[in-house]
Curated annotation (Swiss-Prot):
Full protein name: Glycerol-3-phosphate acyltransferase
Family the entry assigns: Belongs to the PlsY family.
GO biological process terms, semicolon-separated: phospholipid biosynthetic process
The protein's annotated pathway: Lipid metabolism; phospholipid metabolism
Keyword DNA-binding: no
Domain of life: Bacteria
Keyword list, A-Z: Cell inner membrane, Cell membrane, Lipid biosynthesis, Lipid metabolism, Membrane, Phospholipid biosynthesis, Phospholipid metabolism, Transferase, Transmembrane, Transmembrane helix
Protein source organism: Shewanella sp. (strain ANA-3)
């Protein structure tokens, strides 16, 4: 099988894997409202945190990251070049953003993109996670944390393993474009902050 054929097959496989909406499936399994219809309307871990609590959000985060990590890492093991790895990672993110199995209404692609970056190395994964967590704790804005972490990701990659700077920059660009509306709301002071589902008070 030629390298081009293998790359195209992995792009299709990555898109299909990305199209499995973890947020919708976890909410269905746990008897929670459809995240596309509740909260921010975004089927991602942050919105599931709002409507279903931390454990449900953690499950969504794990599976969303896995959707990006698995096809990208498999392609790396197959010897596919760095630029093609970036295209495969973008395909997984586009599956998450425009899922064929869920009416093409998906999330922002942040967890899937960061999952695709994580196999580059533990050090990069730690830098990305630490940046996002610190920024969320400081600002309370998940979107702002994602945007700034996406901007930092190519710099981290260039510093740690410059072979993958271009594909990571491709993913970062996609994340920022996907957050265009969030950027506008942040500038207007209208963006929602991160909050957990409130537990009912005991009688």
């Amino acid at each position: 099988m030629s390298q081009l054929t293998l790359t195209l097959l992995m792009i299709v496989a990555a898109y299909l894997a990305g199209s499995v909406s973890s947020a919708v499936l976890v909410c269905r399994m746990r008897g929670l409202p459809d995240p596309r219809l509740q909260g921010s309307g975004n089927p991602g871990a942050t919105n599931v945190l709002r409507i279903g609590g931390a454990s449900s959000a953690a499950m969504v985060l794990f599976f969303d990251m896995l959707k990006g990590a698995l096809p990208t890492y498999l392609a790396y093991l197959m010897g596919i070049d760095a630029i093609s790895l970036g295209l495969i990672a973008i395909a997984a993110c586009l599956g998450h953003i425009y899922p064929i199995f869920f009416g093409f209404k998906g999330g922002k692609g942040v967890a899937t993109a960061f999952g695709a970056m994580a196999p580059i190395g533990d050090d990069l994964a730690i830098c990305l996670m630490a940046s996002w967590v610190v920024l969320v704790l400081i600002s309370r804005y998940s979107s702002l944390a994602a945007i700034i972490t996406a901007l930092l990701a190519p710099l981290y990659t260039w510093w740690l393993d410059d072979r993958f700077t271009i594909p990571v920059a491709m993913l970062s660009t996609l994340i920022i474009i996907r957050h265009k509306e969030n950027i506008q709301r942040l500038l207007k002071g209208e963006e929602s902050k991160v909050s957990r589902k409130k537990r009912p008070k005991a009688p």
